[in-house]
Amino acid sequence: DIAVIGDCQTNLLGAGFHKAAIDIVDELVELRDFSTEVEDDTEYYEHRDFERMRSEHFYRWLNAIVELCCERLKENCSMSAICWDCNKYMPRGIEGTVVSSFGRICPEHLVERIKDEGIERLASEFFMWNNEERDALFYRNTALSALWEDCYFMPSARSEEDMEINSFIIENLEKAAA
């Protein structure tokens, strides 16, 4: 017997990424026709209802993250980043803000945005892949995340690494604009 064991943390990237991960599981099953056991906290694997998964799991999770940030800042607790790879550089802390993959944010501002615009609008900017398909927002958010997390803001001629990340950012921005 062949056993394939995998784990995928999808909260940081969004509902579209979660769906893509489940699609890969489906393709593996089709290729090899073996039995599967999938544990899916979002219940998407069982129900295949994208909107339900996105609103009941991902939007609730984002709301909880925003509330946690606000609570921690009110308690004067140190919280410099959310959803940030701890193996990457950490931008300098600025009081009242936290760093995320889409920039430096003020949690109170996010609460106001949720009240004024709804969680959906914030989610479309926060999650790299919030929609079912790789759409313009996916490419925009991918570019902005790379710009914030990986870019040295140096000319491509400086190094191979600079050329690769700069090209990646430009390529994704062009796809977003197309």
Language-model features: locations:
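Acidic (Asp/Glu-rich) sequence patches and key acidic residues
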Residues: 1-178
